[in-house]
Amino acid sequence: MARSDLSKIKILSKYIYNNKGLKIGLIGGSFNPPHNGHLKIAKLALKNLNLDEVWWLVSTKNPLKTSKGQMSLSKRVELTKKIANHPKFKVLNIENNLKTKNSYVLLKKILPRLSNMKLIWIMGSDNLFNFSKWYKAKKISNLIPFAVFNRRGSPLRSINSKGAYVLGKRINSSRLKLLSISEPPIWGYFHNVNINISSTIIRRSKE
C-alpha cells in the first residue's frame, strides 16, 4: 500500500512516520449500538495501559455475526462519536476507508505506516472466546499485543479458552502497564472488571 493511501484518511495523516513512542489502544467492533460497556473498557485501557489515545474502529461488518438488524455504518459511526466524547478518543471507520472487512488485513496495512507508535488491541473477554475463529487469528496475535477486559462470566473460562491459547503468552498481572510496549505475541487480562451490558441485550430490549 502506498503511503498516500493512508494519508487519504485525514485523521491519520499526521501520524504517518511521526509521533515516535505514542501509545495507542485500538478497540474494534460493530458498535451496533455502542454502549457504556465499550466506554468503560476504553477508559480503563486509557488509564491502566498508560495510553496516549484510544481509537474506536467501527467495522463495516463483523464476519462472525449476522448483518440482520445492523444499523448503517454512518449511523453507527455517529452514535459511537457521541458516546466516545473524550479528548483522547478518536472514532474511525478505517476498514471502510481501506476497503477491507477483517482485522488482519487492516493491521497489515496500517502497522507499517505507524511503525513509530506502540499499538495495542483492546477487547472484552466475550471476544476472546471467538478469537480463534478470526481470519488468520494466529498471525494477528504476532502483529500486536492484546489487552482483554473481563465481561460477563468467569475469568477462568476466558483464560482457558481456545482464543487465549491462540494469543500465546499472557503477561503477569503485575506487569500489565508494560503491555503496550511489549513485543507480540503477548496479551494481558484485566480481572477486576465486570461489564454485563452488551449491544445484543440493548437491541433485544428494543424489539
Please state what every model-predicted region is.
Residues 1-207:
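Nucleotidyltransferase catalytic core that binds NTPs
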